[in-house]
Structure formats: structure tokens, C-alpha cells
Amino acid sequence: MEPVDPNLEPWKHPGSQPTTACSNCYCKVCCWHCQLCFLKKGLGISYGKKKRKPRRGPPQGSKDHQTLIPKQPLPQSQRVSAGQEESKKKVESKAKTDRFA
């Protein structure tokens, strides 16, 4: 590498200027597009997948966040529907009649 004169401004250092001239749409010095192309070409808009944020852990103060919920027994239905009893009787009666056939 060539030694750089410390008295030179940074934009005058060798290699700091673009090799090609700036176009009327895109400036290589400032890397900005004109407003028309920015809106027309949709520059700066990406429809790609967004990165998910990592899940946060439990709060620092509590050891287990589920200890606050009191445990209750699950409700059990004691009643048996009449439709089930009738269907059982029909199956039993069919089984008895088929046995003799």
C-alpha cells in the first residue's frame, strides 16, 4: 500500500473517489438515489422474512411463574346421557338375539 499523506483530507486520499462519474440517478459518493428512482424502483423496501426476536425468559424476580396459579381438580361429569344407555341396551339385545340365530 502507498503511504497516505496525513495532511490530505479523507476525500482526497487515493482510491477514495469512484472510478466512474456519478449518474444523474445514483451518486457513488453519497450512495443515494434520486427521489423518483427511490420511489419507482421500491428501493429500501424489502418484503423478505423478518427476523424473529428471541423469546424473553421468565422475570428475574420469580423462580417459577406458574406457582401463582392455584391447582384445582378438573371437573368430572357424573351424569351419563340417556342416549348412551339406550344404545347400550340395543347392542345388548341384538347380541342376545344373534346368539340364538
From Swiss-Prot:
GO terms for biological process: DNA-templated transcription; positive regulation of transcription elongation by RNA polymerase II; positive regulation of viral transcription; symbiont-mediated perturbation of host chromatin organization; symbiont-mediated suppression of host innate immune response; symbiont-mediated suppression of host translation initiation; symbiont-mediated suppression of host type I interferon-mediated signaling pathway. It is found in: Host nucleus, Host nucleolus; Host cytoplasm; Secreted. The record marks 11 as: Essential for Tat translocation through the endosomal membrane. Residues 1-48 are annotated as: Transactivation. Keywords: Acetylation, Activator, AIDS, Apoptosis, Host cytoplasm, Host nucleus, Host-virus interaction, Inhibition of host innate immune response by virus, Inhibition of host interferon signaling pathway by virus, Interferon antiviral system evasion, Isopeptide bond, Metal-binding, Methylation, Modulation of host chromatin by virus, Modulation of host PP1 activity by virus, Phosphoprotein, RNA-binding, Secreted, Transcription, Transcription regulation, Ubl conjugation, Viral immunoevasion, Zinc. Residues 1-20, 48-101 are annotated as: Disordered. A motif (Nuclear localization signal, RNA-binding (TAR), and protein transduction) lies at residues 49-57. GO terms for molecular function: actinin binding; cyclin binding; metal ion binding; protein domain specific binding; protein serine/threonine phosphatase inhibitor activity; RNA-binding transcription regulator activity; trans-activation response element binding. Asymmetrical arginine methylation by host PRMT6 seems to diminish the transactivation capacity of Tat and affects the interaction with host CCNT1. Acetylation by EP300, CREBBP, GCN5L2/GCN5 and PCAF regulates the transactivation activity of Tat. EP300-mediated acetylation of Lys-50 promotes dissociation of Tat from the TAR RNA through the competitive binding to PCAF's bromodomain. In addition, the non-acetylated Tat's N-terminus can also interact with PCAF. PCAF-mediated acetylation of Lys-28 enhances Tat's binding to CCNT1. Lys-50 is deacetylated by SIRT1. Residues 1-24 are annotated as: Interaction with human CREBBP. Zn(2+) 2 binds at residues 25, 27, 30. Residues 49-86 are annotated as: Interaction with the host capping enzyme RNGTT. Pfam families: Tat. The cell attachment site mediates the interaction with ITGAV/ITGB3 and ITGA5/ITGB1 integrins, leading to vascular cell migration and invasion. This interaction also provides endothelial cells with the adhesion signal they require to grow in response to mitogens. The Cys-rich region may bind 2 zinc ions. This region is involved in binding to KAT5. Transcriptional activator that increases RNA Pol II processivity, thereby increasing the level of full-length viral transcripts. Recognizes a hairpin structure at the 5'-LTR of the nascent viral mRNAs referred to as the transactivation responsive RNA element (TAR) and recruits the cyclin T1-CDK9 complex (P-TEFb complex) that will in turn hyperphosphorylate the RNA polymerase II to allow efficient elongation. The CDK9 component of P-TEFb and other Tat-activated kinases hyperphosphorylate the C-terminus of RNA Pol II that becomes stabilized and much more processive. Belongs to the lentiviruses Tat family. This is Protein Tat. The lineage of its organism: Viruses, Riboviria, Pararnavirae, Artverviricota, Revtraviricetes. The gene is tat.
